[in-house]
């Protein structure tokens, strides 16, 4: 384990404004990738990019407002859940799956860094940096805040960390048995003893069992669809939603629901939602599921599947079924989704636009507001509530 040294305390820290805690606290945090670009459908390294950053956003007000930005390594590669904020909004953990090769700035290579940011200091700052595995992407922390799991996309492993006093300590690494499994998203059930892990590369969802710092796998994996990716669990722990990204070839893609009340757990619904549904999120009350579809916005303009925008689709959750309620255009290369604590504001990351799309969600209707610029590509977004 390495604590953060001079890298964190020198020019790597960039603050927009001092972090003033809103009266009714409701923060979102975004992981912003500055080093990756998409030019006419080709993803590559940016030329002389500024540092990647984490933005801290006050969503207790409308429109939401960015109140601080801290330099920390991150990446768009992997599911848009590569950042986590503690329930008391005191610290953040963010992962980095890729970086520009220091000896060859024309190449992007796997990264393994995990950074911890203290939000209680003024200004907020990085206080620890530790390594996970190659392609460190998804970060999820147990409900009691004592155990963190990091999916290492480039090596097919899952890193296990203990969490105490805003510090991580490595306690193990689990080999998934397939270096091309591409583990993508992991989420704990409310009991803290069970978790789910999506495997984009071999089309599986694993059920994990947690006993202290020991993590084991159920021998029966779940099947949802082609390339299961982003994962979310509703507040009550009764349903999980999984985005099935498909092959990115223009075909319609899907979202599946997993019933968490039955033993064994099982997939109970799969519905077509759009093309490449990278982002998805349950509303705070669990009554709605928001899905962000890329819709070909990352492809070359010459592709027959190219669109100049993505789509945000909101579904009502009716038992174990989904019913479409509303749809609106969003920016290009859409990523993660977050709701405000009251469920009335929705934020969606758009990598190419370097901004968050902002919507009011009231009366079953989406009303777009002004985009919120975060300076570089918002690759992931999280709030403190589950």
Could you tell me what each predicted segment is?
Residues 10-18:
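Bacterial N-terminal signal peptides
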Residues 1-11:
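Bacterial N-terminal signal peptides that target proteins for export
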Residues 21-386:
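Predominantly soluble domains enriched in secretory-pathway, periplasmic, or organellar proteins
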